[in-house]
Amino acid sequence: QWQVDQTAFALASRYYWAKVNRLAEHPEAIAQPGPDAAERTDTRQFEEAPAAGRRMVVMTSDLFRAQQTAHAFADILGLPVTCDQRLRERSFGEWEGMTRAEIKAVAADDYASWKQHTGGETKHGVESRAAVGQRGADAVRALVIDSAYSDSTPTTLMLVTHGSWITATISNLLELDPDGMNALGGMRNACWCRLKVRHSVNGTPTEQPLWELEEYNKAPAIADSADWENGPTDLRGPHMPSWQPIVW
């Protein structure tokens, strides 16, 4: 939770304009003094701000841990959160919930194939990297052209999802081989990426949206000065497990 909250604070600061936009659209949510007060908050302060002309949409996987993360961010800014099954994590089939040691113990050859990106995990019902990347990219492309968000209002889509989904989806959008060993690295917990979408080149419309990866696997500044994986010592109790590096 510590990681999630630190990321939420950092991104809420970056996207504070979204709170102003929300209050401009819903002035009834602006706190007002009692009826006997000499003055009341002028809602035009929000309605006339440039931020009122923008839009932030927060969507999350319907899995619980993603919803927690989404609300940690959105609740600070007073934004609604919409669940979308298309943002669900990669399915790990028979291996769901197992540790790497447990998988290796029962399927050593297929575990090795998984490490080498040669697909042995799919024998156990695990969704392939290509499949999850296609599923995710289809969802992102559909959201970008959704009539609810594709009008002239500048819109930021905040998609809260899972590490394997993120890496595979971005790989697909950038036309990278998700099974290639020269690829995007795995996501750290509670980190973010930022994509910019373009619909034209030099004024000429493109058939499909074009994507620019502006940030990948980014964390708040505190991640560089604290134990990001385990949290500060004053937050750790004797029954909290310690994070262990993943050894492939």
Residue ranges and their predicted role:
Residues 1-79:
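Active-site-proximal alpha-helix that buttresses catalytic centers in soluble enzyme cores
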Residues 122-147:
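Internal catalytic-core helix/loop-beta-alpha segment
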Residues 56, 152-164:
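Generic beta-sheet signal
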Residues 110-131, 239-243:
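Short glycine/proline- and acidic residue-enriched helix-loop micro-motifs
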Residues 59, 82-84, 214:
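General small-molecule cofactor/ligand-binding pocket signal
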Residues 72-76, 93-116, 130, 138, ...:
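Preference for well-ordered, secondary-structure-rich cores of eukaryotic proteins
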Residues 60-61, 134, 160-161:
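Short beta-strand scaffold positions
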Residues 90-102, 149, 153, 171-248:
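Acidic, low-complexity terminal tails and accessory targeting/binding regions
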